[in-house]
Amino acid sequence: MIPSPIQIKQPTLKFGDTGDYVKQLQKFLIKRVPDIQSLVIDGVFDEITLLAVEIFQYRTFLKQDGIVGVVTWEALYIGQRPDLPLLYSGCHCDDIAKIQSVLKFAPFIQETLGMKGYYFGKIDGVFGDRTQAAVKSFQNDKQLVVDGIIGSQTWDYLMELAALISHFVL
């Protein structure tokens, strides 16, 4: 696991909250999710702020709950999830299901983006042969070391792909 470089002490924020911490959140979201042009810094955690939080969480492989807790705050500060695990064949976890989902993106997204999907199996959270083949194909396309292991460079490119397809899935 890649260690978290900083510890953030901010309150947990959710839909309906107001105040200066929400303004700070909105400033980070404008920087991290610039494609949400209707997001304004007004200190109100409204539907647009919620959408921006969920998009950011999706793009950084965080739990998509719309709640800004410690890990989401840390990710907002550093621009990516702070606790990215090293994943490889045989692993079982929620992160793998999220990766499978991103690598499997729907045919209509494939047509729109002019890209193929990478994963064609069941989204089951198991890093098996199909997931490993998908990761290797993805690594090859991105000109990374093709080892089937999801380390920091592969995570970076997966987050780029998640950002690209988030327009279609959220």
Feature names for model-found ranges:
Residues M1-L170:
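Cell-envelope/ECM-targeting effectors and their regulatory/trafficking segments
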